[in-house]
A protein has these predicted regions:
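Short, acidic/turn-prone active-site loops that include or flank metal/cofactor-
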Residues: 6, 109-111, 177
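Short acidic-hydrophobic sequence patches enriched in Asp/Glu that either
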Residues: 13, 179-183, 247
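His/Asp/Glu-enriched, well-ordered alpha-helical/loop segment
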Residues: 51-79, 126, 145-148, 152-154, ...
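C-terminal cap of metal-dependent C-N hydrolases
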Residues: 169-172, 224-276
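Short, glycine/acidic-enriched loop or turn micro-motifs at the edges of active sites
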Residues: 34, 87, 110, 160, ...
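Glycine/Thr-rich phosphate-binding loops of Rossmann-like dinucleotide-binding domains
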Residues: 38, 91, 114, 162-164, ...
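Short, small-residue-biased leader/transition segments that mark boundaries at the very start
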Residues: 2-9
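Histidine/acidic residue-rich metal-binding segments in metalloenzymes
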Residues: 10-154
Length: 277
C-alpha cells in the first residue's frame, strides 16, 4: 500500500515538474519504463525468454509510460523527448501526437532497429540492455518511423561496462551496450545502403535534429558561425566490427564480428582533430 501511495506521489511530482519545465522553457527527456511492471525481467517477454529460462519484460512496460507522458505533455504544453524507444506502439503513439500538433519527439538506437530477441541465441550478458531487444514487428515499425519522420533522432544509449559486469548470465549482468564507435557504420549499413534513409537524413537524425531538440543553435550543421564539431565519414570501407579495437574501455557490444560498411575517419571538436583513423 505504501509503495502505491509513493507511486501516486511521484506521478503528481512528475506532472508538477512538467508544468515548471514548460514555464521555464525547458524540455523533458523521458526514459519510458514502468519499473513496477519489470519484476526482475532481463529481456523481451517472448518465446526466447522461455527458451533461455529468463524473466521477460513486456512491451507494455514502455508503452504505458509513453502514453502517460504524451498525455501530460498535452496537458502542460511542455516539449517532450522520448528516449530510446523500442516498441511499435511507442512509434504509433508518437505519430498520433505529432498529427495532433503536440511538441513531442522520439529517438531510436541502432540495436533496436537492427536486432531482435531472436538474435539472442544463448544466455549472453552482452545482449542485456534497457529497453530490451524486441520483436520483428517492432523493428519494422522503428524503421518505418525513421523513414517517415515520426522518429526524429538516432542515438546510442551508450552505456559502457567492464567485462566483469557483462561477461556473465543475463540475470546477473549489468544492463547496457556501447554505441559511440559503431552507430555511424551500423546506421549507414542498415538504413542508408538499404534505401530507408538518405545520407542527409542520416546526418539530420544523428546531428542536426538532436542539436535542435537540445536547443544548441551553434551545433548540428556545417555552416558559417557554427561550432566545428564534426566527423568525416568514409562510406567506402567494408570491415568486421572488432570490439578489441575500440578506443573505449567498454567493449560490451552484441555487434562484435558483424560486417558493416563505412567508418568515421576523423573527429573534430571545436575545429581541432581529436580522433583520426
Amino acid at each position: 500500500r505504501s509503495r502505491g501511495l509513493g507511486d501516486v506521489y511521484k506521478r503528481q511530482l512528475y506532472c508538477k515538474a512538467m508544468k515548471i519545465a514548460k514555464e521555464k522553457g525547458i524540455s523533458v527527456f523521458a526514459h519510458c519504463e514502468d519499473i513496477t511492471m519489470v519484476e526482475g525481467g532481463v529481456m523481451n517477454a517472448d518465446e526466447n525468454a522461455v527458451r533461455l529460462g529468463l524473466k521477460g519484460i513486456t512491451n507494455s512496460v514502455e508503452d504505458v509510460i509513453v502514453a502517460r507522458d504524451i498525455l501530460l505533455a498535452k496537458e502542460t504544453g511542455v516539449r517532450l523527448h522520448l528516449c530510446h524507444c523500442s516498441t511499435a506502439d511507442s512509434v504509433e503513439m508518437i505519430r498520433l501526437a505529432k498529427e495532433e500538433g503536440l511538441p513531442v519527439t522520439g529517438e531510436v538506437c541502432p540495436h533496436h532497429f537492427i536486432l531482435t530477441a531472436d538474435d539472442i541465441l544463448e544466455d549472453d550478458g552482452n545482449y542485456k540492455m534497457n529497453p530490451p531487444l524486441r520483436g520483428k514487428k517492432d523493428v519494422e515499425a522503428l524503421r518505418q518511423g525513421l523513414a517517415d519522420g515520426t522518429m526524429d533522432v538516432i542515438s546510442t544509449d551508450h552505456a559502457p561496462h567492464s567485462e566483469e559486469e557483462k561477461n556473465r548470465s543475463m540475470a546477473k549482468a549489468a544492463f547496457g551496450i556501447v554505441g559511440l564507435e559503431t552507430s555511424a557504420a551500423l546506421t549507414y549499413t542498415e538504413l542508408v545502403k538499404t534505401g530507408i534513409l538518405s545520407v542527409m537524413q542520416m546526418a539530420e537524425k544523428m546531428s542536426y535534429n538532436p542539436a535542435q531538440i537540445l536547443g544548441l543553435s551553434d551545433k548540428g550543421a556545417v555552416a558559417e558561425g557554427k561550432t566545428a564539431d564534426l566527423v568525416i565519414f568514409d562510406p567506402n570501407p567494408t570491415y568486421t566490427i572488432d570490439k578489441n579495437t575500440f578506443v573505449s574501455k567498454g567493449k560490451n557490444t552484441p555487434f562484435h564480428g558483424r560486417t558493416v560498411t563505412g567508418e568515421v575517419r576523423f573527429t573534430l571538436v571545436d575545429g581541432k582533430v581529436v580522433y583520426e583513423k
